[in-house]
UniProtKB/Swiss-Prot annotation:
Native source species: Armoracia rusticana
Family that this chain belongs to: Belongs to the peroxidase family. Classical plant (class III) peroxidase subfamily.
Cofactor note (record): Binds 2 calcium ions per subunit. Binds 1 heme b (iron(II)-protoporphyrin IX) group per subunit.
PANTHER family in alphabetical order: PEROXIDASE 37-RELATED, PEROXIDASE 72-RELATED
Cofactors, names only: Ca(2+); heme b
Name of the protein in its database record: Peroxidase C2
Cell membrane is among the record's keywords: no
Enzyme type, top EC level: oxidoreductase
Sites annotated Transition state stabilizer: R62
Amino acid sequence: MHSSSSLIKLGFLLLLLNVSLSHAQLSPSFYDKTCPQVFDIATNTIKTALRSDPRIAASILRLHFHDCFVNGCDASILLDNTTSFRTEKDAFGNARSARGFDVIDTMKAAVEKACPKTVSCADLLAIAAQKSVVLAGGPSWKVPSGRRDSLRGFMDLANDNLPGPSSTLQVLKDKFRNVGLDRPSDLVALSGGHTFGKNQCQFIMDRLYNFSNSGKPDPTLDKSYLSTLRKQCPRNGNLSVLVDFDLRTPTIFDNKYYVNLKENKGLIQSDQELFSSPDASDTIPLVRAYADGQGKFFDAFVEAMIRMGNLSPSTGKQGEIRLNCRVVNSKPKIMDVVDTNDFASSI
């Protein structure tokens, strides 16, 4: 009995050690020796993309956010459809709005040329998000790396987990808490990613014309801002027209998003909820603090980004390092494998 009990305790301790080591493998210095070029490659790729697409930085940050909220930061959002699973690209929160996949493809091809079979797509997306923020004038931070890529996508989970533009504050809190982001500062700081980028008219039409099926606009919307938005998104107009999240500094990563919320000029309902909802007693002080001090916002954003980046990472021998971010690696037949390096380089 004693021996059996000891073995059970030993097994439990080994399990805890394995979990601890798995998380410990995420490190800002993970690629210092194996692929230090990855950071410059990411920066240069985004710089090139920005010349023709000023909103690409915001789009890449959003991709990383939507990746991490579904099964952790595992690059599952980058996978295309297969016969085995539906892609997350088809989920409600991504279809016809998630973008930047081609930029990640270009980045990955350059990284594979410089450091073959070394940098995961999950890490690359996290690094690209950080570089996007920096290039838009936001804060810098060291990205903990060492993630592995998932072997499948999770469309149904994406539909369940991703916040929507019309989410109430309580729904937002629940969705953040469900993935492990349980601090009010996580929600408020990460929502600040809407300080740059654009949104489609289709996601704000109810706010402008028929809020909660009332036949009237959202009463929390500033009247002058409502008039501006109605000109950009007229009733029966083109629902794909793009509107800036932040009219003040639409391409700059700053704290104006929170200034807008204080003035009831949040573009989508889920943003304005942080300041105007009856449930906002724990988020209003943070909105005020970030509006009054950009440094406070930047510090909180960096902390929240690192916390989000640490959500359920696949590390060690879990998952794989994809050679193409859109598809899982081909598995060789045992009889065909003579030199694994030759095989891998031919995929």
